[in-house]
Amino acid sequence: MKKINSFLLVILTLFLFNSCANTKENKEENKTQKERLKIVNIINFIRLCEPREDEITEEVLYETVVKQVEIMKKYKLGGTFFLQYDALMDSRYQQLLKALPADSFEIGAWWEIPQPLVENAGYKWRGRYPWDWHADVGFATGYSPAEREKLADVYMADFKKIFGYYPKSIGSWFIDVHTLNYIYEEYNIIASCNCKDQIGTDGYSMWGGYWNQAYYPSKKKCVHACPK
């Protein structure tokens, strides 16, 4: 009887030990999972001008970015600043963003097409203002594939001349597949961001974007996730 009791005690001890070990492992695994999921990146995109509102001057836009930097530093919030080409070529933004610590801030490309980029690429500007928010002018979709590549080359060359490296990320309300693939292959970007859905805003509509988290984009349409 004593042998049976001893045997049962050993089994019970092993069961309790394994249960505790498994519980500890599960907690560690859950903790690791939660840590992996806590990914937040603040993105501010910068345009030089805003022709839709007279009171939003170039100075107002610049001071807005200065304030954003102050707040992010105050609360120790890292993030990314995407520069539209007209802002990229402005010495105020160059000086401000070059001074940011690289371990907390990233500088990337904002892919809307303003007048200076088009003209520096050797093309005629068709917009109503130096930056036009309509899709046939303000986005790469308004240009031929060859023109899109030239626009990308001009932007990247000037970005590297100013910052000493090519941007690793790019953002836009909409990036076409040809442009994104070209910039990925030629300049080795590792990430991009886009708008998911909007109806009748800014002179165009988009629908059917992939919500929730990061994804590998489809080679047919960037707002859709790759099926494989």
PLM regions: where:
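Metal-dependent polysaccharide deacetylase catalytic core of the NodB/CE4 family, i.e.
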Residues: Y85-W173, K228
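Hydrophobic faces of well-ordered beta-strands that scaffold small-molecule active sites
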Residues: V40-N44, G79-F81, I107-W110, K168-I170, ...
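Active-site beta->alpha N-cap acidic-glycine motif
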Residues: E29-D103
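Bacterial N-terminal signal peptides that target proteins for export
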Residues: M1-L8
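Catalytic grooves of carbohydrate-active enzymes
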Residues: R47-E50, Y62-M72, A157, K161-I162, ...
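Active-site-adjacent pocket scaffolds in enzyme catalytic domains
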Residues: K168-K228
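C-terminal motif of bacterial Sec signal peptides marking the signal peptidase cleavage site
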Residues: N18-S19
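Bacterial Sec signal peptide processing site at the extreme N-terminus
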Residues: N22-N30
